Amino acid sequence: MICASEQSVTVLDSIYDEVKKEFAYRGCYFLKKGEELDKVRKTIIINGALNNKIPGKSAYEIAKLAGVEVPENTKILIGEVESVDISEEFAHEKLSPVLGMYRAKTFDEALEKAERLVADGGYGHTASLYVHPAETEKIAKHAEAMKTCRILINTPSSHGGIGDLYNFKLAPSLTLGCGSWGGNSVSENVGVKHLINIKTVAERRENMLWFRTPDKVYFKKGCMPVALDELGNVLHKKKAFIV
């Protein structure tokens, strides 16, 4: 699992059962609350950090490591949890086929939970939203709320985040910048352009200076009487600048 992989999913109450049914149909296993859930909790996160034995392992192998029996063809282990606090192991970045699943009464509540998960899981990376394309207000609201550099709409996070496969706005790359939010120097997918040394030759150029001159400039010795007469009687000027 790459860093852009889904780590948690938040589902609205109105479609929660339907989504859960679809997950099960697709080969996901919902951990039973109690012993099964706790066993996997203690396996995926140890002393507040990811257990280095689970990345690269299948859902079946992780369950076996935790002492939980699941079908061998299980694709994802899902833990239905409530807390988005860092004390909840399923709220962490897991880098494995293990998901935390949350439910929310409203879209705003779902956003709040997602914001917290991003805050503790790591600012700057990737957030996904599955919504009807016509609901542009929700898309805009989600994009504004998520402090991530990749905002994916109706796109698988793993494959969408690396660009090219499901969208053409992200450059194809397996090195994904997280911007200053994530302590990176770039906020986009790192590509060839970031590895090129570009020379810039800058010749001296100075900013243009200008000043506004009057319609007439009187000079030469003896011009003063004529100048003042013309300015006052012909041009009807009341002020003159004398250098």
Residue ranges and their predicted role:
Residues 207-243:
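An N-terminal, well-structured beta->alpha segment
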Residues 1-85:
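ALDH superfamily catalytic-core signature
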Residues 68-208:
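Conserved C-terminal structural/oligomerization subdomain of aldehyde/semialdehyde dehydrogenase
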Residues 6, 124, 237-239:
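A general structural motif
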